[in-house]
Amino acid sequence: MLKHRMTFILVAIAVIFPFIGYLLSFYTDWLFFAETGFSSVFMTTVYAQTGAGLIFGLLLFAFLQLNLHYANKGSFPLSGIYIVGGGDIRINRNEAGRLVRPVGILISLVLAFLAGNWGAMRWEDLLLFANRVTVGMADPVLGKDVGFYLFSLPFVELLKSFAGFMVLAASVLSAAAYYVKGGITLDDRGAGVDPRVRRHLAVLVGLFGLVVAAGFYLESFSLLLSNNGAFHGAGYVDVHGRLMTLRILTFLTPVAGVVLALGIWRGDWRLALGPPVVIVALYLVGVRVYPGLLQKFKVAPNELTLETPYLENHLKFTRYGYDLDKIETVPFDVDTKLSAADIANNDATIKNIRLWDHAPLLKTYSQLQQIRTYYKFFDVDNDRYMVNGQYSQVMLSPRELSYADLPSKNWINERLIFTHGNGITFGPVSRISKEGLPEFFVKDIPAVSLADIKVTRPEIYYGELSNEYVVVKTKVPEFSYPTATGNINTTYAGKGGVPIDSLLKKALFAAQFKTEKILLSSDITPESRIIYNRNIKERVRTIAPFLSFDVDPYMVVDDGGKLKWIVDAYTFSGRLPYSRPVQGGMNYLRNSVKVVVDAYDGTVSFYVSDAQDVMVKVYSRIFPGLFQPISAMPADLRKHVRYPNQYLQVQAAMFAAYHMTDPKVFYNKENLWQVPTLGEKPMEPYYTIMKLPGEKVEEYILLLPFTPSKRDNLAAWLTARCDGENYGKIRAYTFPRDRLIYGPKQIDARINQDSFISQQLTLWSQRGSEVIRGSLLVIPIEKSLLYVQPLFLAADKAGLPELKRVIVAFGDEVVMEENLELALQRLFGARKSIGTAAAAAAPPGAPAAAGQPASSLAKEAMSIYQRALNLQRQGDWSGYGEELRKLEQVLKRMAQ
């Protein structure tokens, strides 16, 4: 008795224990959603999961029990189960028959639980179907609205799969029950099936025939999502071969199912075997063999002619899938007539050329501004601000807390004292000190502002490195920042986190986070709050798991000096007909949501930036309290919204081929583009501030060049606009195809071939310095192109990268100078807009201004020559080469 009781207790614990974990997770999730103000989102999801799970689970259980109940009724004449090959071994059927009902219930419960869990995981398909909308664009083959494919087809396929599993499971369990009861016999003479058993199984077979017919019907829609080799979507062979066969099979299969069921009912196995053979043969011939012959003998010799209408469908729907129709194509008639006056007229563009690369700058920030080992700069982001009245591109990096680098690791330090990061490092993209280091607008702890950007709330409780829970408002003061005289402490004053105001909550959170310290700590008071889901990516994904989120969240400073994160979110689908998928199967993508997360109190807001997106329309109907219009976003945050780099990369990868809208040109790949590669990596889009051709003012844009496929000259440059009413507008500026326009790889080769530059790089390397070549940027100015590449030097791989040189290429000239202003002076002559700073930075021998007297130039040349001789005598060959380079430029000026 005791043994049975212990067994029961152990089984009960094994069954209940997983549910305890589930209930704990459910409760903490509920508290999290209540804290963030999205309880309705949580409950909608819970209702959908619970409803779907119950419906699928109960349906399967009821159907299985109905069939098992019928199978278990009555008895059969045979008294025992004969084991084939087992000699005299027999099992008493009456004894075994008593187990049919309890075992059947147990198996039904297990299968129902699995089916319910499977259905609960497909809750999103259920909600999309229930809240579906029409798109207003029909597929060109079957005439169904695109909304059917996006919202209805996944759910209908789900029902078909469930129905098939339900009938198969009932058939197997019923057959097993009949075997145990004696309705099905197996012995050395063969198999025997009772007439009542045949009738039961015949009904199930007929039902399965309906499921197979539904599968053929749905497969016709799948043709529009297939890959036929030349393109994605239904082609000539699919429409004129497979589609007709699938339609025939859709109507023929139920008839075949009835005949098959009739044969089983009567026990006529010849009649029963005929229909499956016919269906399988028709499928193989009509869906496999005939289309292959049609492709080989009719389509292949006339592919372009026959496939043109379907290619047009493919082009249209792929362009719609990635929103490529909004890209405006503009001819860009490039020339090499850029002058000093043009440079002066585009001063804002020049000043905002990004010289600081992310990787070297992150390393430099870490060494100059990390302050303590437990702080860490995880990433550097680009943005734009009005700084001292000037529209400026900046680079910003949050100073987050790295728990892995805490000097003393214990629960109190990690959970109560060190709770947050502190402040940002913030500076211009192009300005450098005399030592080759970045300049700052905001730096240090506490924040020191060297411009009119103020940070009033520097604490970062929510970030990219905040992966652990913390408890705030405890008896233990929180560490804020270090000073020369000691540490400054703080107490959290925000509304983030969940109050731990009861013993029950303490116990539940202690169990959830697997530590008794939350329950036992005397430092935790009724006013204390536990903050979890602090990682901003995890935080927004928990609230909206149906969205995809950008890999690069970025921080902004609002007008009140508070730190906010902006995360780009995407809606997506893999169900758009005729659209080419990217890796992962997605063939519809929109950046239709911007998410703002407060770095101090964790407040999350979702804003719809693309109201035309059909997916976000449906999600807005499913979760009516989740999204706000973009107009509701505070104006000081809206001016920092930017076009996502990741999104433009996907669009550019598609636009490289799908800018060709003529099916013949697309088929022959006559004008295929590619993103240029430098080394082994393709170029990435980069942000800059510039005046677009035909526009009157500078604006913040995202830019990416293209080259023709397998060639290195430029074909076009793609730009996505980020500011105000122009946000989201994309232009492709195309170059003349009959002229050679140097591409990044060709400019890179010319830089490598320049004797002076290569000599300098070699000398630096020989002295033990690590030479880091920054990103090569293409900068359109007026009707010309500048190429700019920064050079960084570090004493070794662990050294501090310093920006020591800037290479600028224009036309056939390549120059390298200490900064961008000097390089532009050498190329175009002095500019008034460069002003005193450039003049002060210029060493003796810098090129003279336009219009300088010849006598003055001659004296300048002689001075340079004398310095070169002195350096030669001293053995300073690097300096000697530099002076000769300057002498060459002065002589060119004299020759003009």
UniProtKB/Swiss-Prot annotation:
Membrane topology type: Multi-pass membrane protein
Transmembrane segments annotated in the record for this chain: 6-26, 46-66, 99-119, 158-180, 201-221, 245-265, 271-291
Main location: membrane
Keywords carried by this UniProt record: Cell membrane, Membrane, Transmembrane, Transmembrane helix
Places the protein is found: Cell membrane
Disulphide connectivity of cysteines: none
Pfam entry (one): UPF0182
Keyword check for Transmembrane: yes
One cellular-component annotation, GO: extracellular region
Family as reported in the entry's similarity comment: Belongs to the UPF0182 family.
Annotated protein name in UniProt: UPF0182 protein GM21_2279
